[in-house]
Design a protein with these regions (language model features):
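Aromatic-acidic/polar surface patches that form glycan- and anion
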Residues: 8, 65, 126-127, 182, ...
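Helical substrate-recognition/capping region of FAD-dependent monooxygenase/halogenase enzymes
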Residues: 60, 74, 143-219
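Conserved mid-domain beta->alpha element of the FAD-binding
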Residues: 88-90, 94-175, 179
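Short capping/connector residues at structural and topological boundaries
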Residues: 8, 17, 99-101, 106-109, ...
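Conserved FAD-binding catalytic core of PHBH/FMO-like flavoproteins
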Residues: 1-96
Length: 219
């Protein structure tokens, strides 16, 4: 089965560190910061004094080398500052895709979650949309299995969840294009938006570091 959509080449470092710091708990996002020039970075707090760090590395980064503590720790020190103690808990390097299967049903096989559609992590759409898939599907399966509905009911799963997946893919792709612009024009537009957002409220709504998902409306 083939996927329809885009594969993004940029690599990202993801790291969990344990630290006691006075950073605000809300998510921080940096565009072109001095500690990661021409790239992006993210920091947000999790439970038990664990902080998640996400850094764009670019398409040419060596994933094996970038996972090594000798490479990761200096990057994090440049981000947090030399006087912030931390313990490195976990690291990985990833790429991502924004795509879906042409159909979420193939005979008696039904696809949900990442097996049906894949999106970037910006906007928390991956696991959330998988739960929505299952919520749409399980009651239909139950009715078919006990003979209270025909198998044709399962076709509505595909018809309803594909538009929802397309909406997530569209918004996830837009977030990714804003965070990781691929052309000089896209970068200039992004940077102008960020500059205007400093003083103009209308521009703040245009800053896109990951539009959060919304419930799908079935028509």
């Amino acid at each position: 089965l083939d996927f329809l959509g885009r594969v993004f080449e940029d690599r990202f470092l993801i790291a969990d560190v344990v630290m006691r710091a006075e950073f605000p708990s809300q998510r921080w996002f940096w565009f072109d910061p001095p500690f990661n020039p021409e790239q992006s970075a993210l920091l947000h707090r999790q439970a038990d004094n664990v902080w998640r760090i996400d850094m764009q590395l670019g398409p040419d980064a060596d994933p094996e080398r970038e996972r090594e503590p000798a490479q990761v720790i200096p990057r994090i020190r440049r981000m947090l500052g030399p006087d912030v103690p931390f313990d490195l808990e976990w690291t990985s390097v990833y790429t991502f895709k924004c795509r879906r299967l042409e159909s979420f049903r193939s005979g008696r096989v039904l696809f949900a979650g990442d097996s049906a559609h894949q999106v970037s992590p910006f906007g928390a759409r991956g696991a959330n949309s998988g739960v929505q898939d299952v919520d749409n599907l399980v009651w239909k399966l139950a009715l078919v299995l006990v003979g209270e509905a025909s198998e044709a009911l399962l076709d509505s799963y595909d018809a309803e969840r594909i538009p929802a997946a397309d909406e997530n893919i569209l918004n996830s792709s837009r977030s990714t294009d804003f965070i990781t612009p691929k052309s000089n024009g896209s970068r200039a537009l992004r940077d102008a938006t960020l500059d205007l957002a400093t003083d103009w409220p209308f521009a703040r709504a245009l800053v896109n570091s990951g539009r959060l998902s919304r419930p799908a409306t079935y028509r």
